[in-house]
Swiss-Prot record:
Alphabetical UniProt keywords: ATP-binding, Cell cycle, Chromosome, DNA replication, DNA-binding, Helicase, Hydrolase, Nucleotide-binding, Nucleus
Extent of Basic and acidic residues compositional bias: 696-705
Quaternary structure and partners: Component of the mcm2-7 complex (RLF-M). The complex forms a toroidal hexameric ring with the proposed subunit order mcm2-mcm6-mcm4-mcm7-mcm3-mcm5. Component of the CMG helicase complex, composed of the mcm2-7 complex, the GINS complex and cdc45.
Binding, ATP: 347-354
Superkingdom of this protein's organism: Eukaryota
Gene this protein is translated from: zmcm3
GO MF, one example: ATP binding
Major subcellular site: nucleus
Pfam families xrefs: MCM, MCM_lid, MCM_N, MCM_OB, WH_MCM3_C
Protein name listed in UniProt: Zygotic DNA replication licensing factor mcm3
Family, similarity comment: Belongs to the MCM family.
Subcellular location: Nucleus; Chromosome
Function: Acts as a component of the MCM2-7 complex (MCM complex) which is the putative replicative helicase essential for 'once per cell cycle' DNA replication initiation and elongation in eukaryotic cells. The active ATPase sites in the MCM2-7 ring are formed through the interaction surfaces of two neighboring subunits such that a critical structure of a conserved arginine finger motif is provided in trans relative to the ATP-binding site of the Walker A box of the adjacent subunit. The six ATPase active sites, however, are likely to contribute differentially to the complex helicase activity.
Amino acid sequence: MAAPAVTELEDQEMREAQREYLDFLDDEEDQGIYQSKVRDMISENQYRLIVNVNDLRKKNEKRANMLMNNAFEGLIAFQRALKDFVASIDGTYAKQYEEFYIGLEGSFGNKHVTPRTLTSRCLSCIVCVEGIVTKCSLVRPKVVRSVHYCPATKKTIERKYTDLTSLEAFPSSAVYPTKDEENNPLETEYGLSIYKDHQTITIQEMPEKAPAGQLPRSVDIILDDDLVDKVKPGDRVQVIGTYRCLPSKQNGYTSASFRTILIACNVIQMSKEVTPVFSADDLAKIKKFSKSHSKDIFEQLSRSLAPSIHGHLYIKKAILCMLLGGVEKVLDNGTRIRGDINVLLIGDPSVAKSQLLRYVLCTAPRAIPTTGRGSSGVGLTAAVTTDQETGERRLEAGAMVLADRGVVCIDEFDKMSDMDRTAIHEVMEQGRVTIAKAGIHARLNARCSVLAAANPVYGRYDQYKTPMDNIGLQDSLLSRFDLLFIMLDQMDPEQDREISDHVLRMHRYRAAGEQDGDAMPLGSAVDILATNDPNVTSEEQQELQVYEKHDSLLHGVKKRKEKILSVEFMRKYVHVAKIFKPVLTQEAASFIAEEYSRLRNQDQLSTDVARTSPVTARTLETLIRLSTAHAKVRMSKTVQLQDAEAAIELVQYAYFKKVLEKEKKRRRRDEDSDTEGEQQTQPDGEAKKRRKKRRAQEGESHDPYEFSDTEDETPVVHTPKTPVNGQEEMETDSSAKPGLSGERLKAFKSALLGAFKSAHAQSIAMEALMEAINKRNDSPFSQAEVKAALELMEEANHIMVSDNIVFLI
């Protein structure tokens, strides 16, 4: 008699939980959030509702705690309540699907874990696990209900199937029926049977959160129905689901050790880049800094890169250009021109190569470290592995795929075998990994920059051999590196004295608050235990420090005038500068073309200069990428002559270990000397007009690569003046885009200023902005007009648009 009483009590608790969940969903009298979400779900033909745990916790804390700690019963009751609620809104839609599903998001507290901290205390609980997807199985159909017809008896048999990956408490028999009780054969009615999609993925803990010197942990995850194919290898995800153990059998007996899986109910893609939080004050400081240091901003930023390393100024400039990158172009015919910059450092031991790599790991938004001995070719690109349980082939992502849109730092590059080095050729130029193995044909994105460090062939650099003999790498690989620097350990008493003074000051420096004998922690990152960042407002309130506080012991007495930028300011400045996509001007393009031909002929002009890497057509793209990166440092919309000159200087130093002297401009052969003298005295604009006029008279065809005069001119940035009342006035720009008249632009600016005033904020979301400017407006603005006007104002540095949020500068 005890068992039926327990069952009746459990059913009563289940009905009570279902009623409370139904009250939570039916919030029409409150705010109507979830009622509108359910209606949107029905209109989009979906069957999974995403519920924020924080909302449930506010309304019914007891029920939220029971759901978190007893996931199976809680989710079953929640899903039944959702089906009842959908039936009350739309009865016909509720009959279309067998089940409706609940997905969770919000703050999970101590249940927000990584694969390493996923322990037995989390069993049968709702957990949120974050990591990188390393393996993905194929999507297979899984039978939920089978229908069988018996021709002899004219009867139909129906059977449901559940296993330990389902929410039901007891799994059903896995035997597929072929005969009925009287041994009559059965025919499967596939049209009436129900199947669901089933996929298994493996996520691994993130490299920045894994402890040093230990193997990264991983966990298997079950994805069903609409969650399959949401992720691919290399994606950073947060998976919310139920943690469950499965018995493992050996020789027909169940062993005492269990394997664990996570049954997912929601998958959230994490951002590809770690985007810092910007406030209006931060943007104002960045803009002010770029204007006040417009002449020496490249020197200032490169000097602040790795300030603990003495010297190597050109290498720091190259690393700054690598962090910013060029502009990636994908042409209409499918050709991709990469914008990533690859750098190779070759030199004697103890010249701070590995320290530079380590600084990039701390500064870059995403960086994956590897070493030459500890990495294979498939470990860097991708591998096809076999699943131990099912025997299926799986695709496993390598380090370069995991570092998509980031930086891969390869130390001890010379210790890799030639076969492994050949595997990264495609990644360095095409930005993707193509796999054709074991019946799997796949293409994975690996758009990453490569920063590699290596030693010469003989351990130390031999001055009596050519650079190519010392490097010992094949030309096909060297040409894929944009810059190759040779770092020598030269014996110079003055330089040795400066380095020793610098290193000794570093060792004597002690951070504020450091106690005797205590080591400061390596990282001070705070883990956010929620699916969305709750500390955005508190981070915005912290004031951004532009410069580090001068310390005579750390920075030296002589360098008091040389201010060092703070790491946080550098990170935010690089992130803002990467948004710009500068365009080449005719002047810069001509200069790059001339210097490229000069570099190609340098071996014939001077035999005493030995180059470090071959000058190929890729060198021309290198010059364009470096010029674009230098223009990004200045936050310019166009690549000017000074950007091209800085790029040429970097390339010359990398190729010839010194900056070559500038040649005098050769006179044009096809022009008369008198005409040339007259042209040099005239302004550039008149000379161009005369050249165009001469072409028109001679009847030449139009040159498709001719740049317009507007691209040669540097755009004038208008600084908004601050009036007496404290509000910023936006000047009217006369240059309106096609389809947007000057009057409409003026009306838009006044409406935009009114929207910022009424919101009392420095930033407005795009949807709220559209609603505000078209409110009480007789002639509302269209989406195209708003986009064109915002582009004009962004070019004039009045506003900044990022992630569909408009910032007033």
